[in-house]
């Protein structure tokens, strides 16, 4: 028994030891970033209401010191259009973490969206000091300098961005700067490099095709537009440009077939309805042409090319008062184009307002130094008024322009223009066919009026297509993959590269609007 008791005594301490309470759990100290994973999850799922609820809870727990929660809330405010509120929150993030370049980039972007481009450049320069190898900072600086019209600085920054990381949007912005400076050759070189880097980018292919189209290099234009349509058969900009090329060469039915496809994608496009209207004009369906052009004018009331075409069609239909109305409106928007004044003078002549017609011709002669039709029409008016000496002076000026054009280009003149010049030369006793030595090719379409008024132009008609501006404003979809564990600071969503604003578009070749009215 003694041994048993002794054994029990030896077991008691072990049992008591096992029943002692364990040491208390370590206290939970508040972790500022403990809800970051949940905030990030709601944000990438675009569940912004739930995201804002978690952010509010997190900021209450951390007394407003959670940088990531503030950052994401600022992003949501920006998406909702509250740019000023987002700017203030990004500035708070910059105060909490002054060495973080991402915070400064977002501050600068908000300033840019508020139109404060100079302030944005200053903040971007501060961010560049913290991270000198960020292509995004260089690109956005280039965009800001572009809006400030400091094109040299903008080019330097964009070239730096390309050295750090080649990106389609940077090429587009650099090409746009060259276009703003009027340097079409350099713009084409930039877009060629961009196409080499990204050969399947339909925006770049379409833009390059349009630039070649503007230069009249139809083979290369058709090649690049065809490539764009190969990768994206529904690319309405390329289809519109291809239709314009066909329209320029008189294939109105084929062009209308192309435009029918485009109308499904962009039914409210002013250039589309302008082109359709001029196709009907080339087919001599004038009522349909006016209907389409007036729709284009309704969609773009300040486009002078549409007004020009409306004036031209009304002249063809002998509706001279309406033609005067539209041509006057076009002159208000484009006061430096001599051909508009010539057409206005034709309308005024048929309205029997000779004094104002003479003034319009004087202005047309002053502004247009290349088109012999201006001088020919003016000479006809002067001859009809009995001023043969002044008419002879205008006729001789016309001869100089014709000789210059024949020496410098293989241009074929309108047969009715040649006939009228020969008749006027005979009437002025200067002989016939003095400058018309080349055979004349009849145009496909001629538009006459009972009053004997016909105007024509030696250049391609105006206002057929305006697709390049949209092509130059592609959006960047630049994102990073965000990952992280509970309690870890997640990477912040990057600031998107700034996108160029759509500018007034570069025109491609118009249609048979060159069949204008020349006075007889």
Swiss-Prot record:
Residues 1-66, 338-520 are annotated as: Required for localization to centrosomes. It is found in: Cytoplasm, Cytoskeleton, Microtubule organizing center, Centrosome; Cell projection, Cilium membrane; Cytoplasm; Cytoplasm, Cytoskeleton, Microtubule organizing center, Centrosome, Centriolar satellite. Disruption phenotype: Males are sterile due to a loss of sperm flagella. In mice obesity is associated with hyperleptinemia and resistance to the anorectic and weight-reducing effects of leptin. Although mice are resistant to the metabolic actions of leptin, animals remain responsive to the effects of leptin on renal sympathetic nerve activity and arterial pressure and developed hypertension. BBS mice have decreased hypothalamic expression of proopiomelanocortin (POMC). BBS genes play an important role in maintaining leptin sensitivity in POMC neurons. The gene is Bbs4. Expressed in the hippocampus and dentate gyrus, the columnar epithelial cells of bronchioles, the olfactory epithelium and the inner segment and outer nuclear layer of the retina. Expressed in testis. GO terms for cellular component: BBSome; centriolar satellite; centriole; centrosome; ciliary basal body; ciliary membrane; cilium; cytoplasm. InterPro entries: TPR-like_helical_dom_sf, TPR_rpt. It comes from Mus musculus (Mouse). Gene3D superfamilies: Tetratricopeptide repeat domain. Pfam families: TPR_11, TPR_16, TPR_8. Belongs to the BBS4 family. This is BBSome complex member BBS4. Residues 101-337 are annotated as: Interaction with PCM1. TPR repeats lie at residues 67-100, 102-134, 135-167, 168-201, 203-235, 237-269, 270-303, 304-337, 339-371, 373-408. Its main location: cytoplasm. Keywords: Cell membrane, Cell projection, Cilium, Cilium biogenesis/degradation, Cytoplasm, Cytoskeleton, Flagellum, Membrane, Protein transport, Repeat, TPR repeat, Transport. GO terms for biological process: adipose tissue development; adult behavior; B cell homeostasis; brain morphogenesis; centrosome cycle; cerebral cortex development; cilium assembly; dendrite development. The BBSome complex is thought to function as a coat complex required for sorting of specific membrane proteins to the primary cilia. The BBSome complex is required for ciliogenesis but is dispensable for centriolar satellite function. This ciliogenic function is mediated in part by the Rab8 GDP/GTP exchange factor, which localizes to the basal body and contacts the BBSome. Rab8(GTP) enters the primary cilium and promotes extension of the ciliary membrane.
């Amino acid at each position: 028994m003694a041994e048993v008791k002794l054994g029990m005594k030896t077991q008691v301490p072990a049992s008591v030891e096992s029943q002692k309470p364990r040491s208390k759990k370590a206290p939970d100290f508040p972790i500022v970033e403990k809800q970051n994973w949940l905030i990030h999850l709601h944000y990438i799922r675009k569940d912004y209401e739930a995201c804002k609820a978690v952010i509010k809870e997190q900021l209450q727990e951390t007394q407003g010191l959670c940088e990531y929660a503030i950052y994401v809330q600022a992003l949501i405010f920006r998406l909702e259009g509250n740019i000023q509120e987002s700017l203030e929150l990004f500035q708070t993030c910059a105060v909490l973490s002054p060495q973080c370049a991402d915070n400064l980039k977002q501050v600068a972007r908000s300033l840019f969206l508020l139109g404060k481009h100079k302030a944005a450049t200053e903040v971007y320069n501060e961010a560049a000091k913290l991270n000198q190898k960020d292509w995004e900072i260089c690109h956005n600086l280039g965009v800001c300098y572009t809006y400030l019209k400091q094109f040299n600085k903008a080019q330097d920054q964009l070239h730096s961005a390309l050295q750090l990381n080649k990106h389609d949007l940077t090429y587009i912005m650099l090409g746009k700067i060259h276009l703003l400076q009027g340097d079409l050759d350099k713009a084409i070189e930039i877009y060629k490099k961009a196409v080499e880097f990204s050969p399947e980018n339909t925006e770049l292919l379409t833009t390059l095709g349009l630039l070649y189209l503007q230069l009249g290099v139809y083979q290369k234009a058709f090649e690049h537009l065809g490539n764009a349509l190969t990768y994206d058969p529904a690319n309405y900009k390329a289809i519109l440009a291809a239709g314009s090329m066909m329209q320029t060469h008189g294939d109105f039915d084929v062009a209308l077939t192309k435009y029918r496809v485009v109308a499904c994608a962009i039914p409210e496009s002013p250039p589309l309805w302008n082109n359709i209207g001029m196709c009907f004009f080339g087919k001599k369906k004038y009522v349909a042409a006016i209907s389409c052009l007036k729709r284009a004018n309704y969609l773009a009331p300040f486009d002078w090319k549409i007004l020009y075409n409306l004036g031209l069609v009304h002249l063809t239909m002998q509706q001279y008062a309406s033609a005067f109305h539209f041509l006057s409106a076009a002159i208000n928007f484009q006061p430096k184009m001599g051909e508009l004044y010539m057409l206005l003078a034709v309308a005024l002549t048929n309205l029997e307002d000779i004094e104002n017609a003479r003034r319009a011709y004087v202005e047309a002669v002053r502004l247009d130094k290349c088109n012999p039709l201006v001088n020919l029409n003016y000479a006809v008016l002067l001859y009809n008024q009995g001023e043969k000496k002044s008419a002879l002076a205008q006729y001789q000026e016309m001869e100089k322009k014709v000789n210059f054009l024949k020496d410098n280009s293989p241009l074929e003149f309108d047969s009715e223009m040649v006939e009228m010049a020969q008749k006027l030369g005979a009437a002025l006793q200067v002989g016939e066919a003095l400058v018309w030595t080349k055979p004349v090719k009849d145009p496909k379409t001629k538009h006459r009026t009972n009053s004997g008024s016909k105007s024509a132009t030696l250049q391609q008609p105006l206002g057929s297509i305006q697709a390049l501006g949209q092509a130059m404003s592609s959006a960047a979809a630049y994102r990073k993959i965000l990952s992280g564990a509970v309690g870890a600071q997640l990477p912040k969503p990057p600031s998107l590269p700034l996108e160029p604003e759509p500018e007034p578009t570069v025109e491609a070749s118009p249609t048979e609007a060159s069949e204008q009215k020349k006075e007889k």
